[in-house]
Amino acid sequence: MRKLLLFGAFFIALAAGGQGAPGKFDGTWNTTVTCDPAGGTLGYTLHFVSTVTGNVLHGDRGTPGQQAYLAIDGKIANDGKAKLTASGVTASSQYTHGPSKTEGQDYSYEVKSQFTDTEGKGERTTGMGIVGRPCHYTFEKQAANAAAANP
């Protein structure tokens, strides 16, 4: 009977939201995006915080649906490889590269990335370079006590 109660308690705890062990890359990451100037378009650098939970990364900057919004999302494999998706809304036309330089347009692209326990690097996939331009991502994991101090 005691084993049955312990077994039942385990499944109740699991059903109540037990998530299992944390992912290898879980934590708070300082994220920097640098997009090179291209074809008369200005370059830029953005800084924001991304969070990894269960080896799934999410970071964003700005207000969803508004100009200059950027979100990056994706799963990091156990070997540190990740194909992340960056999506957002274009900013001023002076920073928007490609044939359609309209402000306020939705966009998305992939970021091929590699993570270690403490850092990561990624590159925007640019295809033939007609629409995309080189963008470089760096990720630096915050120490656990630094993440707690910066909610």
For the regions a protein language model found, what residue spans apply to each?
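Boundary at the C-terminal end of the N-terminal hydrophobic targeting segment
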Residues: 16-20
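Central antiparallel beta-sheet cores of small beta-barrel/beta-sandwich binding domains
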Residues: 22-116, 121-151
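Amphipathic alpha-helical interaction segments
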Residues: 12-15, 36-38
